[in-house]
Design a protein with these regions (language model features):
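Membrane-interface transmembrane helices that cradle and orient dolichyl/undecaprenyl
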Residues: 160-177
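Aromatic- and kink-enriched transmembrane "portal" helix at the membrane-lumen/periplasm boundary
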Residues: 125-159
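Hydrophobic alpha-helical membrane-interfacial segments at the cytosolic entry of transmembrane helices
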Residues: 213-234, 317, 389-390
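Membrane-interface alpha helices of multi-pass inner-membrane proteins
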Residues: 176-203
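Short hydrophobic/aromatic helix or loop-helix immediately within or flanking a transmembrane segment
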Residues: 64-89, 253-265
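Transmembrane alpha-helix segments characteristic
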Residues: 25, 127-135, 222-230, 307-336
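Beta-sheet-rich sandwich/jelly-roll-like modules and their strand-loop junctions
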Residues: 462-523, 531-558, 562-611
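Intrinsically disordered, polar/acidic, low-complexity terminal segments
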Residues: 5-71, 85-128, 174, 203-205, ...
Length: 611
């Protein structure tokens, strides 16, 4: 590639043109995600509402983040997503920040790896960088781009890449092994593939040991980490996903397809829409077979260097081992999972780990060309030209696939628009609910919690306010255990969603306890909503908003708000009462020690209606 460029431009200009070209896939990914991102809760990602609701209601337990899901314990994923949801009222758009950090962080690891193995002051570096960039940001893995839940895979990929970078480029430094082990633990408790990274590192270090039959000290360190992590991970885990497992032939076909998909998809992009799973495995199976053959040939060449723990050889063996373990383990669970069978190996999301087989060979070949490992100068020049021609063909085909892939991101963009429109106020089922989640009861729970807590697509919505008219301020009433304060009002519009009122603190810093509130429709036995207000956290004359479930047909209906407290009047929160004016509604009903009496005052109440 650089040979052809040098006939038109200088080698230095050609070098920097290739480096600049390496940034194109990264920019492409940025625009693709910004355009196609799903920005509302969708499918398995909706399960996060359970943790968010528990957090908001004060029922959250850290141990719940440990619960298994689909053969994994995604502790890191849940922790990051929950903290972000709490901070942003579950604005799904903000989750793509972490997806970007994971993907671009992985690219930074791979760039650093290229610098360590190949160096920068040569023509091979920009060719390697371009190849790595095309593979890492590949639209073949589009499923890991337009859905923020795939942060789980992208973060795992970053932790694994960091671990490999540290231990394979500095194999004799203990501090690197310790940091890499921490990174592998994080990967394992994000997705199960992190355990395959443990195994790949163990095998690579044992193969490179001075005496193969004697346990290597670094391999022992990683074995201990693997055993301890497994002891924490496996108890209580249900590993069976299918009543049947694949035959040896089916497992082989799936694994070869899985390993060949990153290359085959870039040579000719096979996806036509965001959810399409290509049924033909021929191209990817052939690519996977070729990659295994070339990997075997390169491994034979690298074996003497592996014994010396040369970083390029360790990368080749470690990357290939990880990819193969991922392929076989995934195939065991998914090759006969449904009617798609071994075609599941074409799934877009799997290419993120299958690509390590190709990446390991890219790095080793690059290092071999720079180090001149392949014979005399004439043979080395010939090898370099062959590699550059193949790299040029690969880059041209890949950029064509990048262009053809935009239709998938456009499809995701349209799907997101349709999906967002299903989040309308109210809990009545709509046909499009099936796009949110296949189980209607899960959709009903999700919408009920989102509307009640005003999260996600129901956050920052417009509200129409209606304030009850009041006269001059009269006095506060203490909300203690001694009394209950009730007031009835008539809703002026449909879509009742909030009530706002003010509290006062006549007891100052001595204010403690809890104020309990309940809203009911007059004539109904069941309350519409109830909740607590921490009296100690209230500020004098500050407005307090009570969030309600969305009430579709509230216009003209009469409701009653009841407020009660705990403790004595000397520590109670106060509720300001006002002189009534015409049309201000029914007076406050005070219940003192069980004796009900009508007062001649009203509370200042603002009703808000969602539109």
């Amino acid at each position: 590639m650089t040979g052809r460029l040098s006939s038109v431009v200088s080698p230095k200009v050609g070098y920097w043109l290739l480096v600049a070209l390496s940034a194109v896939p990264a920019v492409y990914l940025l625009f693709a995600v910004q355009y196609s991102a799903i920005t509302v809760p969708f499918w398995d990602h909706t399960e996060l509402i359970h943790w968010i609701a528990d957090w908001r209601e004060g029922n959250f337990h850290v141990s719940s983040l440990w619960a298994p899901h689909n053969h994994t314990r995604p502790l890191v994923y849940r922790l990051v997503m929950l903290m972000n949801a709490v901070a942003t009222d579950w604005d799904v758009r903000s989750e793509y920040i972490y997806l970007y950090l994971s993907i671009y962080g992985t690219f930074a690891c791979f760039v650093w790896l290229a610098r360590r193995l190949i160096g920068e002051a040569n023509a091979v570096f920009p060719v390697t960088l371009l190849s790595v960039s095309l593979i890492l940001f590949s639209p073949v893995g589009h499923n890991n781009h337009w859905w923020s839940m795939m942060f789980q895979l992208d973060a795992t990929n970053f932790f694994i890449a960091l671990s490999f970078l540290l231990v394979f480029t500095r194999p004799e430094i203990w501090s690197c092994h310790v940091v890499a082990a921490v990174s592998c633990w994080l990967a394992a408790f994000t997705l199960t593939n992190g355990f395959f990274a443990f195994v790949a590192i163990i095998i690579t270090f044992q193969l490179s040991a001075t005496k193969f039959t004697r346990p290597d000290r670094f391999a022992v360190f990683w074995v201990i980490n693997l055993l301890v992590a497994s002891a924490c991970y496996l108890p209580g885990m249900q590993m069976e996903s299918s009543s049947t497992h694949p035959s040896a032939l089916e497992l082989l076909e799936f694994s070869l397809t899985y390993l060949g998909a990153p290359l085959g998809g870039l040579l000719w992009f096979p996806y036509r829409s965001m959810f399409q799973l290509p049924m033909s495995i021929a191209v990817n199976l052939i690519c996977g077979s070729i990659l295994l053959v070339t990997c075997a040939a390169l491994s034979l060449d690298a074996l003497p260097r592996l014994r010396k723990r040369h970083p390029a050889a360790m990368v080749l063996f470690g990357f290939a081992g990880f990819a193969m373990l991922s392929a076989v383990a995934t195939g065991w669970a998914r090759a006969t999972f449904d009617e798609y069978g071994v075609a599941n190996g074409n799934a877009s999301r799997y290419t993120i780990f299958g690509s390590y087989l190709l990446l390991g060979q890219v790095y080793y070949v690059g290092a071999a060309l720079v180090q001149g490992w392949w014979g005399e100068q004439a043979h080395s020049i010939l090898a370099r030209r062959v590699v550059f021609v193949l790299a040029g063909f690969f880059a041209c085909a890949a950029f064509v696939s990048y262009g053809r892939a935009w239709r998938v991101y456009a499809d995701a963009h349209e799907f997101n628009r349709s999906l967002a429109q299903t989040y309308v106020w109210g809990l009545d089922p709509v046909p499009e609910d099936r796009f949110i989640h296949p189980r209607p009861e899960a959709v009903a729970y999700l919408k009920r919690q989102l509307q009640l807590l005003e999260l996600g697509p129901y956050g920052n919505r417009a509200y129409v306010k209606a304030q009850s008219p009041v006269g001059s301020f009269s006095k506060p009433v203490y909300l203690s255990a001694a009394r209950t304060v009730r007031q009835r009002f008539v809703a002026t519009d449909d879509g009742l969603k909030r009530l706002s009122l003010k509290f006062v603190t006549p007891n100052g810093k001595a204010t403690t306890g809890v104020v309990r509130w309940q809203l009911s429709e007059v004539g109904s036995q069941e309350p519409l909503a109830r909740g607590d207000v921490e009296a100690g956290g209230a500020r004098d004359w500050a407005t307090m908003t009570l969030r309600l479930p969305y009430v579709v047909a509230s216009r003209g209906r009469t409701y009653e708000l009841a407020l009660s407290g705990t403790g004595e009047d000397s520590t109670a929160l106060g509720l300001p009462l006002y002189e009534p004016v015409e049309s201000s509604g029914q007076p406050v009903l005070l219940s003192d020690d069980g004796d009900a009496q009508h007062g001649r005052f009203v509370m200042e109440l603002t009703t808000e209606y969602a539109k």
